[in-house]
Amino acid sequence: KHGVLTIRCREKVHFFRGFMKALEYLETHGADSEFELRESACFQSSGAMLDCSRNGVLKVGKIKEYIRRMASLGMNLMMLYTEETYEVPEYPYFGAFRGRYTREELKSCDDYAELFGIEIVPCIQTLAHLHTALRWKTMQGLTDTPDILLAGDDEVYRLIDAMISSVSSAFRSRRVHLGMDEAHELGLG
């Protein structure tokens, strides 16, 4: 009637959810409709995990597209599973030739997500599930088996520290998901 839209929300991302719900309603019922929509989030965090590994490394533009979609759904958490498809400056072959992300690309995604109120949590592999990263000669002294790092080795701990430091420097989140997929053979090599 008056051409006024009021959206009240607690989180930035919920504004985008409210805006999209209003657009959806107006498309269905017409621009002259008067309406009130109410919605409450049932969870403190909701989101999705994108698998950007195993030759499925999404382009930065595609990640940003997912961020927009997630905002329209009111999701405030993106878990970015990169296995080893990110740069670790101290280990130049880590993630090499796999479409790995640069620190700047990851930072760009995080900056974009922040615009919508979405936290990106990096998900990396530690100790195991690192066959592709460990195939290089420069990594051979770090392996227990072809897929698993050598627990107890100081250089392995330096690698893990470098991995965590690398992804932590690209994201605002103070959380890093440390995956240990398929580590059942740890220490058996």
Kindly give the residue locations of the regions a language model identified:
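Feature activates predominantly on carbohydrate-active enzymes
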Residues: H2-G189
